[in-house]
Amino acid sequence: MLAGVRSDCHSKYGFHASPKISLMYKYGVLTLRGGYGMGFRIPSLKELHSEYDMGGQGFFMIYGNEDLKPEISHQGTLSAEVTKGIFNGSVSGYYTRFFDEIALGLAPDGKNQQYYNADDATRTGIDVMAQFRFRNGLTLKGAYAYIDVHSEVDGHNMASDRPHSLTFTANYSKMFGKVTLSAALNGRWMSSVETWYKNSAGGYVENEYESRTFCSLNLGARFPRGFRFTAGIDNLFDFRDKNVTADQSVTPQRGIGFIGTLSVNIADLLKL
């Protein structure tokens, strides 16, 4: 068990104590963890006084808000982890309740953005991870995440977090003589999400962002005397996001990208 308290003292927002406690129990290959923590965050100078021209081209402005209140949160976590042989896996869950969460959203003019305190905000999530490390140099890893976020303003959920996501990785590395070859396939899928935003007329409009899949492939070879070659393909399946101008998690729109590098380590090259 580990417990502690963090104290904050601010000339404007006063004194605040934030306790935290963590527990861990091990039984054979199983490890159980749990914890509770209280958070306290005062608005930053950027969140209070920003007047930033996004991109420097007059597209839109990001404004601070001098009326922001400190953000207070309470979070509870639980997790279970198993490690046996080539396998490692875990399941974890968390719940966070925010009071006066500081967020960035559309300003009252309907064009620019401004920081604000959400009326009510919660964040609930579950993470599942599994990994296999084989003796032949192959490693497989996969993870699933579920998150349910509510950041309400006037009864509308302004959060744009995608509720479901999957990530996977396959790595292979093998030495042939004095040459080491490697390959890595990485991918991520994110579900669609519906969110609300405030338009220029002061009304609330619901918008949906479609699901997306993004993958990459990387190949590498390491030779004696410090020589190394790498080649990669980004956006392997040529995914192009229709919502890139509005979505917070931007995916490149240039299509498939090819990367190649050849490098040499001078220190290794000059070794006798």
Where are the regions that the model predicts?
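Repeated loop/turn-to-beta-strand initiation elements of outer-membrane beta-barrel proteins
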Residues: 1, 29-32, 86-89, 136-140, ...
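Surface-exposed extracellular loop regions of Gram-negative outer-membrane beta-barrel proteins
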Residues: 1-20, 130, 136-143
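Transmembrane beta-barrel strands of outer-membrane/channel proteins
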Residues: 3-7, 21, 34-38, 47, ...
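Outer-membrane beta-barrel translocator domains and adjoining extracellular loop/strand segments
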Residues: 13-19, 46-51, 58-59, 101-109, ...
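Residues on the lipid-exposed face of transmembrane beta-strands in outer-membrane beta-barrel proteins
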Residues: 21-25, 78-82, 128-132, 142, ...
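Outer-membrane beta-barrel signature, preferentially recognizing the C-terminal barrel domain
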Residues: 31, 38-98, 107-133, 159-164, ...
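Gram-negative outer-membrane beta-barrel transporters
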Residues: 94-97, 116-197, 237-240, 261
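C-terminal beta-signal and adjacent terminal beta-strands/loops
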Residues: 99, 140, 189-198, 219-272
